[in-house]
Amino acid sequence: MARIGDGGDLLKCSFCGKSQKQVKKLIAGPGVYICDECIDLCNEIIEEELADADEVKLDELPKPAEIREFLENYVIGQDTAKRTLAVAVYNHYKRIQAGEKSRDSRTEPVELTKSNILMLGPTGCGKTYLAQTLAKMLNVPFAIADATALTEAGYVGEDVENILLKLIQAADYDVKRAETGIIYIDEVDKIARKSENPSITRDVSGEGVQQALLKILEGTQASVPPQGGRKHPHQEFIQIDTTNVLFIVAGAFAGLEKIVSDRVGKRGLGFGAEVRSKAEIDTQDHFAEVMPEDLIKFGLIPEFIGRLPVVASVTNLDKESLVKILSEPKNALVKQYTRLFEMDGVELEFTGDALDAIADQAIHRGTGARGLRAIMEEVLLPVMYDIPSRDDVAKVVVTKETVQDNVLPTIVPRKPSRPERRDKSA
């Protein structure tokens, strides 16, 4: 606290005029004093201005068609999932803005509840990438969590609050901004309970985690340890309201298709029922017909399913889609590796047959789009090792044989530069 001057006069705040006896603190500057009350007032004004600047106006919120169009630039296929996500995300942020307007006008209109999203589908089909691209477009904090690392409170492993800590960190510890972010929880199928019937023994990494996630999915005031985990019991907790946090929960749900198939197959019993061949049933998109009862049978608890009302399914990518993924999106792998070779002054070319062969290998390995980069790395490794040490290479051509038979890519040598002619008249 500032002290009494040499003349015995009390020091005063240069802004509000209060003496040092009327305030808790008086901070001195070069010929200026400011009290704690004026500092608090300044902070409030700054926070209000920042909040107004960060708030997305309703007319600026991209429409579902615009969201889908943006996703088309980065994600190939999965049209149904794109439409579902576009509508769900648009409605979510429209709901947030409606809540802010009702608070400002002090009216009590119809309360809009949150609709979290459940994404189903095989690995490597774009579930995570769709969520990442959405967050990028909306410019909101985005965090990815792995459900397999979570355990119920009191057991070895991560608490569910650690998911919220990742979101707060993604927002640079701006809690207000984090409260309108997106959290993507992957591998949620791995926390399904081990049997349909409730177990006598405690399932701390399955049903226990589902129970722990219920509150934050629905919306609650959560206490988050800023240093994470349970190793710092005396740390101050960060308070965050999850009411406006959008949760996208995803998993491969291997085996769910059989549960759906068994249920759908029962329709084919009795006179007049439609009878389908085994091949027709196998090729059917089972994930598109998933019902809550199927997810319960798989191992998700009814309360958990009830907090995920929007279901978006992704399908296996066919060969044509994989070839497009390699070359068409803005961040396509072919464009990425072409840029890497350009940095060494070398042109890179893939023949159409080579791209087909890469897609075939990804399908054979069962890794979907996620496996494309691994195949590209294997194919290009020998030339990526040699090219930086050579200055005689103009172009590298990757062919079908390069991919299928491990033949080295075709190397086109650089034409030697002609020596300059001397002018005889000189």
Swiss-Prot record:
SUPFAM superfamilies recorded: Glucocorticoid receptor-like (DNA-binding domain), P-loop containing nucleoside triphosphate hydrolases
Binding site for Zn(2+): 13, 16, 35, 38
Segments forming domain ClpX-type ZB: 1-54
Gene3D superfamilies to which the protein is assigned, alphabetical: 1.10.8.60, ClpX chaperone, C4-type zinc finger domain, P-loop containing nucleotide triphosphate hydrolases
GO MF annotation, one: ATP-dependent protein folding chaperone
GO CC, one annotated term: HslUV protease complex
PROSITE patterns: CLPX_ZB
One GO-annotated biological process of the protein: cell division
Ligand binding (ATP): 122-129
Keywords: ATP-binding, Chaperone, Metal-binding, Nucleotide-binding, Zinc
UniProt feature coiled coil, ranges: none
Function summary: ATP-dependent specificity component of the Clp protease. It directs the protease to specific substrates. Can perform chaperone functions in the absence of ClpP.
Assembly and interaction partners: Component of the ClpX-ClpP complex. Forms a hexameric ring that, in the presence of ATP, binds to fourteen ClpP subunits assembled into a disk-like structure with a central cavity, resembling the structure of eukaryotic proteasomes.
NCBIfam families per UniProt: clpX, PRK05342.1
Family: Belongs to the ClpX chaperone family.
Protein name: ATP-dependent Clp protease ATP-binding subunit ClpX
